Amino acid sequence: MLVKLLRLGALAALLAAAAQPAVADPDPADWPSVEAEASGQTVYFNAWGGSSSINDYIRWVADEVQREFGVTLNHVKLEDTATAVAKVIAEKAAGRDEDGSVDLIWINGENFVSMQEQGLLADGFATELPNWRYVDTGNPSVTTDFTVPTLGQESPWGGAKMVFFADTARSGPVADMPDDTDALLAWANAHPGRFSYPAPPDFVGSSFLKQVLIEQIEDPSLLAEPVDEANFDAVTAPLWRWLDEIRPVLWREGRDYPQNYPAMKQLLADAELDIIFAFNPAEASAAIAAGELPDTVRSFVFPGGTLGNTHFVAIPYNSSAQAGAMVVANFLLSPEAQLRKEDPAYWGDPTVLSMESLSEADRAAFAAIDRGPATLSPDELGPVLPEPHASWMTRIEEEWAKRYGS
């Protein structure tokens, strides 16, 4: 009888343990142990490498985490986050469940959902990081990514919001610029060849398609749910109609598209385009400061709202340096790192921190940032249009390639 009771007790304990939320290993609740394990580790940070200012910022982060924590951070520069996701998928298929080649990944949206659904992410760690106490948890996008709960499997890094900009020396004042996608279509017809967008699946190009879709469909709330193939064609018909109408008056008559945002930015600098856009409110000022765009460039948004979200870092389940990756993720949430990141002299990426959670000195430092001549104030940025469920972007990119891809 005693043996039977012991067995039942053991079974109950196992069931109880299974019912508890998964805890990351190492456990960020024991932060001194995480830092001790991280010292001496090398973290391979897979992140987009298409911006010199972002690359410089990541180099600064690497210097800081090496100096403070003994962690070596190597930036693996990507053109497309899906490349890193594919690596982890291949490693899991090959049974490489430890010592993976990707330790930390800059991610959000459909790539995050894909990794979460396939069990490719480390257990929830983000909300246990010491610097989580500074995060603006009143912003739902720091815990929900494209309508999908993050479950602590990715740590917020920065904010993003679509902003348009133009060279006012050629286009005239931004007050005369289009104020929604219908007006943009009319403007493009009046200025043939002076507008374009990066070809999906480039992130900025795909984001533009979402902006158009949200504005053009009758019921944007449909986009909060996963794609239903039964009504995909009907729901997205207004998007394809808009794209068909604008294509003949795009740059190169829509026969070619900029490869990515840097290529589109260069076309503005070369006076081949008059209006472009980015997913960072400070991008225009940063480009002016870097000498990449003339100082006559100014930003504008659509009064009805533009697309916005949060971007994150996540740790693959088979990372060879999970402790080191946690230390880097935690440093990225520090007031020091977030302050430098928001400064357009370095990057200009909006913070994910709550000003109320910071010390008076840190709040003053954020308030003192010179945001540059082309950066709109928070009050001028207008409403945020929430991201659709990630499954919509996957299907829209596929359909765009069929219709307009080379």
Q: Which residues does each predicted region cover?
A:
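Mature extracytoplasmic/periplasmic domains
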Residues: 306-307, 311-380
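Short, polar/charged alpha-helical segment
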Residues: 30-39, 46, 51-72, 164
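A ligand-binding cleft/hinge motif common to bilobed small-molecule-binding domains
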Residues: 112-114, 276-294
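Bacterial N-terminal signal peptides
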Residues: 9-18
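Extracytoplasmic ligand-binding site segments that recognize negatively charged/polar headgroups
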Residues: 48-60, 76-83, 98, 102-262
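Bacterial N-terminal signal peptides that target proteins for export
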Residues: 1-9
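Periplasmic-binding protein-like
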Residues: 160, 242-246, 257, 281, ...
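Conserved C-terminal helix/tail region of periplasmic/extracytoplasmic solute-binding proteins
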Residues: 26-30, 266, 373-406
